[in-house]
Amino acid sequence: MQLTMREQEKMMISLAAMIAQRRKDKGIKLNHPEAVALITDYVLEGAREGKTVAQLMDEARNLLTREDVMEGIAEMIPMIQVEATFTDSTKLVTVHDPIQ
């Protein structure tokens, strides 16, 4: 299977997000890379499903709470920017204060 660098990056994000979700489901607090991967994957998949930028910006903010992540992680992530492929074009989705 021949994958472009972008496709490889998306697969790594997806894998990291799956691991993060599994840990979250077990009640294990997420670290920085896991939290970012989970939110990023949500945005990438949502764009693929046909959601709008506004929907994703709103929904991604409700994905994780401070109780889901290790101490100090929420403050380390003031925003996440994801370049996602939507049905009509590629757009930059900015999620401000992604961990409530």
From Swiss-Prot:
GO biological process, one term: urea catabolic process
UniProt xrefs under HAMAP family: Urease_gamma
Principal localisation: cytoplasm
Protein name: Urease subunit gamma
Keyword Cytoplasm: yes
Biophysicochemical property: pH dependence: Optimum pH is 7.0.
Source species of the chain: Streptococcus salivarius (strain 57.I)
Location(s) in or outside the cell: Cytoplasm
GO cellular component, one term: cytoplasm
Residue intervals passing through the bilayer: none
Temperature and activity: Optimum temperature is 60 degrees Celsius.
